[in-house]
Regions:
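Short helix-capping/linker segments at secondary-structure and domain boundaries
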Residues: 10-14, 132-139, 165-166, 401-410, ...
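Conserved short alpha-helical segments that host acidic/polar catalytic motifs at enzyme active sites
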Residues: 1-244, 248, 263-264, 268-276, ...
């Protein structure tokens, strides 16, 4: 949520770098964008509501050696030009990702000092507070160190002081921020992919660290103003992974990368021992939560270990009765999900083992968990996850298999990439043509199929904006069936050997009430009257079926959203990385 980019250097125009960086941060979700740069020792600010293209249209043909930019996803204050970042108060101009919980208290104090405010944001209050401190001590590092103790909540700041127009300052707590290191130029950014066009060298900034950045030097301080040494890391991925490479959208490109993702994941060594634990809590949000449900079914079935799957935003408020030896598994694509991170901190504080399953190396969750397994999906830009979700469920399936007495069918495992490509190359447009005019679409399944239905339904509503719900098939007759009328689409997922006939019985119940039944299965269906459309999944061993079953559900969602003319990569109101609670 929100994206920050900053540049100081002599090789490029900061305006061009910042606009390019903001475009690479669009996937994080935003409703306004802005930029601040220095011209003739004065800070120039431009802000616009809507897409970055709106901001570009008002920019002058200026050149500058230093600047900061921001994409805002509204939290405090509506998405208006006045509330968009950057904000300038006195000599301080800043951009901010996060939430200052005590900003109203600070605002009241600042108003008593004579400060006035043009926006409703906590960010403008932060700018005023830093300006007030700087007036007192004439020292930016000291001023920011005071902020570390005074600001409650989460934040990542990029700051320009109009009295020091060759310096960027940065500060973070519980919100992602990295420093990009170049030659005669340096950067600040919310993530590494946004600056890969310019450098693959970066410094991870930890909580409460303050950074002073010039074109030649990066100096990092702790909250007591002591200089600390930081290691420079090198991003080893392919920079082309953050480009569309000829595909019409990032989401379609990422779906087409799934075969390679599965190949890499299946060849990776997953050696973590879960058999020493009596119980496992999986904490996650959104699609990662659905991946956790798949993991629960696999671990309980194959390893005979009790698994609880918990929505992270609720888990942190629960009372925890850790009995025996417990493991908390935190699943997050970005590794920055605020609610999930909070759960890890709770477990760590109670001396419970934690395992992160994340896609981004060096991310916050990867750093705070006692153990980590990296999914090998590579950068994922589309807001709606596809390949990262697939990597998560594959990792969990392989983790369960390797900790059980079961031996996976290696022939099926090796054929998975081929089967995935076969499913991707099927034509789902005629089905999408029927679905895209509907107001409601339902998914039903049992057991692990129900978990896949939940993900399929989420994917559909995320990008098509059609109301969709997933229900346990056995609950259909307990109320949900009243929603079904003539022509209501019901997508039935039925791959479980044990539960197949029961699920088919539920499909018949829906069809008898007029439902248009779309059956997704790997079985030979004898009674064709059960369904109106059939999507066949290649036959593989039961442990691997979820990997194949989700592919057509992703592509149906994609084709429906495309027919509706939606912005598939950047659905309205959504953010890729949810970094506030």
């Amino acid at each position: 949520m929100c994206g920050i980019i900053g540049y100081v250097g002599e090789k490029r125009c900061s305006i061009d770098v910042i606009i390019d960086g903001l475009k690479h941060l669009e996937y994080r979700g935003y409703d306004s964008a802005g930029i601040a740069y220095v011209k003739d020792n004065n800070v120039v600010i431009e802000r616009e509501v809507g897409r970055i293209s709106n901001l570009e249209s008002v920019l002058k043909k200026d050149t500058s050696h230093i600047g900061i930019g921001h994409t805002r996803w509204a939290t405090h204050g509506k998405p208006t030009k006045e509330n968009a970042h950057p904000h300038k108060v006195g000599n301080i101009t800043l951009v901010h990702n996060g939430i200052i919980d005590n900003f109203m208290e600070l605002k009241s104090t600042l108003m008593s000092e004579g400060y006035t405010f043009k926006s409703d944001t906590d960010t403008e209050v932060a700018a005023a507070y830093i300006d007030s401190l700087y007036k007192e001590n004439n020292d930016m590092i000291k001023s920011l160190s005071i902020c570390v103790n005074k600001f409650l909540g989460s934040y990542a700041f990029g700051i320009i002081n109009e009295l020091e127009t060759d310096v960027l300052y940065a500060l973070r707590k519980d919100s992602p921020l990295i420093i990009g290191v170049g030659e005669n130029e340096n950067f600040i950014a919310s993530d590494v992919p946004s600056i890969l066009k310019y450098t693959n060298k970066y410094i991870d900034i930890e909580n409460d660290e303050i950074v002073k950045i010039t074109k030649d030097e990066v100096t990092v301080y702790d909250k007591n103003c002591n200089i600390i040494n930081k290691e420079i890391s090198v991003f080893e991925g392919d920079a082309n992974l953050v480009e569309k490479n000829g595909y019409e959208t990032y989401m379609l490109k990422e779906i087409h990368e799934e075969a390679e993702v599965i190949k890499k994941t299946s060849e990776a060594s997953i050696d973590f021992d879960i058999t020493k634990y009596d119980e496992i809590d999986i904490v996650a949000c959104g699609s990662a939560y659905h991946a956790g449900l798949v993991g629960k079914y696999m671990i309980e079935k194959l390893c005979n270990i009790k698994v609880n799957v918990c929505i992270a935003s609720e888990y942190q408020y629960d009372k925890h009765f850790y009995k025996g030896k417990t493991l908390v598994i935190a699943i997050s694509q970005s590794g920055e999900t605020a609610d999930t991170k909070k759960c890890v901190n709770i477990a760590n504080d109670m001396d419970v083992d934690t395992l992160g399953i994340v896609n981004v190396k060096g991310s916050s969750i990867a750093r705070i968990c006692k153990h980590v397994i990296y999914t090998l999906a590579g950068p994922e830009i589309a807001v709606a996850t596809t390949k990262a979700y697939l990597a998560q469920i594959t990792t969990l399936i392989l983790l369960a298999v390797k900790n059980s007495k079961e031996k996976i069918n290696t022939e099926d495992l090796q054929k998975l990439p081929y089967y995935i490509e076969t499913l991707i190359n099927k034509d789902y447009t005629s089905l999408a043509n029927m679905l895209h005019t509907k107001d409601d679409i339902y998914f039903i399944g049992r057991g692990i199929d129900y978990a896949l239905c939940m993900e399929g339904s989420l994917k559909l509503k995320e990008i098509s904006y059609i109301h969709s719900e997933a229900y346990a098939a056995g609950e259909l007759k307990h109320g949900t069936i009243s929603l079904i009328s003539e022509g209501t689409p019901v997508i039935v997922v039925a791959t479980s050997d044990e539960l197949y006939l029961k699920t088919i019985s539920n499909a018949k119940e829906a069809k008898a009430r007029g439902a248009y039944v779309i059956l997704v299965t790997d079985k030979e269906v004898i009674n064709e009257g059960v369904y109106d459309e059939l999507i066949s999944i290649p036959k593989v061993t039961e442990e691997l079926r979820p990997i194949l079953t989700i592919i057509p559900l992703q592509l149906i969602s994609y084709e429906v959203a495309k027919l509706k003319g939606n912005d598939i990569d950047k659905p309205k109101n959504l953010a890729k990385s949810v970094t506030v609670e």
